[in-house]
Amino acid sequence: MPRKGPVPRREVLPDPIYNSRLASRFVNRLMYDGKKGVAEKIFYGALENLSEKTGEEPLRAFERALDNVKPQFEVKARRVGGATYQVPMEVRSDRQISLSIRWLITYARSRGEKGMVNKLAAEFLDAFNNRGGAVKKKEDTHRMAEANKAFAHYRW
């Protein structure tokens, strides 16, 4: 925690092709070692691939895939009298986006397809159709929150 108050959030500039801040955030998260050009090539290639398979506009299909992965609830550990409880909490909208982006990229990287463009496109398509690793992660998170609903009164 900084002593001089909250650190201001930096605004992410919209991406050059779709003029979307969401796409820009995704590219920044996908990037390794500052190689933004490579990350953009992967992202835009995956979107074109997704658009061909769904027949929808690329950005709209991406946003729908992202919406299908966004968690509504999560559990946070809370210590009460020596015991740690998993307390279900609602997820803030900015965190929903961050988690869904992180999960999509993580599960895309762990897929078996050849090349990151194909892996990401396949994960987008699965998320678009409510399947895949990222959607399963969201469902697991919701299941954990549901199972620990009894501890909801420990919310702070």
UniProtKB/Swiss-Prot annotation:
<protein>
    <recommendedName>
        <fullName>Small ribosomal subunit protein uS7</fullName>
    </recommendedName>
</protein>
<dbReference type="InterPro" id="IPR005717">
    <property type="entry name" value="Ribosomal_uS7_bac/org-type"/>
</dbReference>
<dbReference type="GO" id="GO:0006412">
    <property type="term" value="P:translation"/>
</dbReference>
<keyword id="KW-0687">Ribonucleoprotein</keyword>
<dbReference type="GO" id="GO:0000049">
    <property type="term" value="F:tRNA binding"/>
</dbReference>
<keyword id="KW-0689">Ribosomal protein</keyword>
<comment type="similarity">
    <text>Belongs to the universal ribosomal protein uS7 family.</text>
</comment>
<dbReference type="GO" id="GO:0003735">
    <property type="term" value="F:structural constituent of ribosome"/>
</dbReference>
<dbReference type="Pfam" id="PF00177">
    <property type="entry name" value="Ribosomal_S7"/>
</dbReference>
<keyword id="KW-0699">rRNA-binding</keyword>
<dbReference type="InterPro" id="IPR020606">
    <property type="entry name" value="Ribosomal_uS7_CS"/>
</dbReference>
<keyword id="KW-0694">RNA-binding</keyword>
<dbReference type="GO" id="GO:0019843">
    <property type="term" value="F:rRNA binding"/>
</dbReference>
<dbReference type="InterPro" id="IPR023798">
    <property type="entry name" value="Ribosomal_uS7_dom"/>
</dbReference>
<dbReference type="InterPro" id="IPR036823">
    <property type="entry name" value="Ribosomal_uS7_dom_sf"/>
</dbReference>
<comment type="function">
    <text>One of the primary rRNA binding proteins, it binds directly to 16S rRNA where it nucleates assembly of the head domain of the 30S subunit. Is located at the subunit interface close to the decoding center, probably blocks exit of the E-site tRNA.</text>
</comment>
<dbReference type="InterPro" id="IPR000235">
    <property type="entry name" value="Ribosomal_uS7"/>
</dbReference>
<dbReference type="GO" id="GO:0015935">
    <property type="term" value="C:small ribosomal subunit"/>
</dbReference>
<keyword id="KW-0820">tRNA-binding</keyword>
<comment type="subunit">
    <text>Part of the 30S ribosomal subunit. Contacts proteins S9 and S11.</text>
</comment>
